[in-house]
From Swiss-Prot:
Keywords: Cytoplasm, Methyltransferase, rRNA processing, S-adenosyl-L-methionine, Transferase
Gene Ontology CC annotations of this record: cytoplasm
SUPFAM superfamilies referenced in this protein's UniProt entry, alphabetically: Putative methyltransferase TM0872, insert domain, S-adenosyl-L-methionine-dependent methyltransferases
GO MF term list: rRNA (cytosine-N4-)-methyltransferase activity
Protein name (record): Ribosomal RNA small subunit methyltransferase H
Primary site of residence: cytoplasm
Reactions the enzyme catalyzes: cytidine(1402) in 16S rRNA + S-adenosyl-L-methionine = N(4)-methylcytidine(1402) in 16S rRNA + S-adenosyl-L-homocysteine + H(+)
Naturally occurring in which organism (per UniProt): Methylorubrum populi (strain ATCC BAA-705 / NCIMB 13946 / BJ001) (Methylobacterium populi)
Family: Belongs to the methyltransferase superfamily. RsmH family.
Length: 351
């Protein structure tokens, strides 16, 4: 999803919204190696930055762009009109991209790009409830369906809230935050982002000199839980593996350590760098066909110049792989486990 350009002070740069530059754009295009006509899939359309760059890579490039957010699909209408039939916008989840492609009459793709997480448009619209910097309803749903963040905050048990904040948000004070939430909601429901942010700020003290808001990690954890973002990532990796042609490339940009760990383990296992555990014999490692060749040997990070212009890019990491002609193995249970809340005994150290 396209992240809006930012000045060093965090204010939106003067640019047309349609021309938002995605994070690591040049690096993603280089990793994809767009050297021939073909079909590219942008699994996370957002503001259309990657899609636009894919279309501009050559006159014969065709693109199918996917987004679960109906607002993003509507906003992309002008881009579709200007693409001369080379762009199709599809509302749906990128975890279903193989099914969505089949619905479009396409069995395979040459390239897939996934930009994981919340988009600039979602963060910058207060009524969507993603940002602790703007007051709005506590929603956080990317597609508008299912339980909202308010439903989780006001309805989940304290222990479950603590697990969400710790595992998905990496908030070390998750138990204290969960306890404060439960105590506050006994008095009145927590309905807005400002209410929740103020509550968290009273529990989590920022480190001296840190630019990170005390509510950052808790909001991240809730957002990931509301949208099942890690489960969607796991499904998207496997779906991309199924649709890519031999020689096709997959590029994935992540912004969270657990997201990156999932992508790293996926490429490591599928390229033969790590053994893949057998589903039928848990704990038994077995060789598996290599379905990917690594394009990036480690994570590609944004340049200092990019992070100065766009502070949101500072945690971005890019990993990419090239599809071999080997069959797609069964889904990796190890990364499916990473995408789920751990068992109680695996919660780790929290306060």
């Amino acid at each position: 999803m396209s992240r809006a350009p930012r000045t060093a002070k965090g204010e939106t740069a003067r640019a047309e919204p349609a021309r938002h530059v995605p994070v690591l754009l040049a690096e993603v295009l280089a990793a994809l190696a767009l050297d021939r006509p073909g079909l590219a899939v942008d699994g996370t359309f957002g503001a259309g930055g990657y899609t636009r760059a894919l279309l501009e890579s050559g006159p014969d490039m065709r693109v199918i762009a996917i987004d679960r957010d109906p607002t993003a699909i509507r906003a992309g209408a002008d881009l579709v009109e200007g693409a001369g039939g080379r762009l199709r916008l599809v509302q749906g989840r990128f975890g279903d991209l193989d099914t969505l492609l089949a619905d479009q009459g396409e069995a395979q793709a040459d390239w897939v790009v996934l930009d994981i997480g919340v988009s600039s448009m979602q963060l910058d619209e207060a009524h969507r409830g993603f940002s602790f910097r703007q007051d709005g309803p506590l929603d956080m749903r990317m597609g508008g369906e299912g339980p909202s963040a308010a439903d989780l905050v006001n309805g989940e048990e304290e222990s479950t809230l603590a697990d969400i904040l710790y595992h998905f948000g990496e908030e070390r004070r998750s138990r204290a935050v969960a306890r404060a939430i439960v105590e506050a909601r006994r008095r009145a429901p927590i309905a807005t982002t400002a209410q929740l942010a103020d509550l968290i700020a009273g529990v989590v003290r920022p480190e001296p000199g840190s630019p990170i808001h005390p509510a950052t990690r808790s909001f991240q954890g809730l957002r990931i839980a509301v949208n099942d973002e890690l489960g969607e990532l796991v499904r998207g990796l496997h779906a991309a593996e199924r649709v890519l042609k031999p020689g096709g490339r997959l590029a994935v940009v992540t912004f969270h350590s657990l997201e990156d760990r999932i992508v790293k383990q996926f490429f490591s296992a599928r390229s033969g760098r790590a053994a893949q555990a057998s589903r039928h014999l848990p704990g038994v490692e077995r060789p598996a066909p290599k379905s990917f060749r690594l394009v990036t040997k480690g994570p590609v990070l944004p340049s200092e110049a990019e992070t100065e212009v766009n502070p949101r890019a500072r945690s971005a990491k890019l990993r990419a792989g090239e599809r071999t002609d080997g069959p797609a193995p069964p889904p990796l249970s190890a990364i499916e486990t990473l995408a789920s809340l751990p068992a109680p005994q695996g919660r780790g150290t929290r306060r």
